[in-house]
């Protein structure tokens, strides 16, 4: 359907699941990170640009990306870093709910600088980097793992 037809219930549910959940995780994680640590969230290009059929999830991802920045600022003095990974589309359970998903995959293969889609392992390796000391100076970032598609959008 159209974004303008989003129900209040649907809007709030998307915000709760996709954005506010990070706030709760960060609050609880801080309790077990007395010496600092790292928190990583996943997002999607639809939080930065309007993506056909992504609708309320795009608004929720935009909220999540702002949440990452505010949590990075808030938890930085505790040596807790907060970052996001904006992953290219992967075949997941949630992807099944996105209309035209195969068309999106094809467009990335044709237009992204690397001319291919990314896989879950590439996203996982980026998360490992963000969770490791190799990224000790990185916080409040949204790293794109999408074969460069975000750069040409």
Set out the residue ranges of the language-model regions.
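A short, exposed helix-loop element centered on a Lys and neighboring polar residues
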Residues: 26-27, 69
């Amino acid at each position: 359907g159209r974004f303008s037809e989003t129900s209040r219930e649907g809007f709030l549910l998307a915000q709760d699941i996709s954005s506010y959940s990070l706030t709760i995780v960060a609050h609880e994680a801080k309790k077990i990170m007395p010496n600092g640590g790292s928190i990583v969230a996943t997002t999607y290009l639809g939080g930065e640009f309007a993506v056909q059929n992504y609708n309320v999830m795009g608004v929720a991802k935009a909220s999540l990306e702002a949440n990452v920045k505010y949590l990075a600022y808030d938890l930085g003095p505790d040596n807790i870093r907060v970052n996001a990974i904006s992953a290219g589309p992967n075949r997941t359970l949630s992807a099944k709910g996105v209309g035209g998903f195969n068309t999106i995959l094809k467009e990335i293969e044709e237009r992204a600088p690397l001319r291919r889609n990314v896989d879950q392992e590439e996203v996982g390796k980026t998360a490992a980097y963000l969770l490791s000391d190799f990224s000790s100076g990185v916080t409040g970032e949204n790293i794109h793992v999408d074969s460069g598609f975000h750069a040409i959008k």
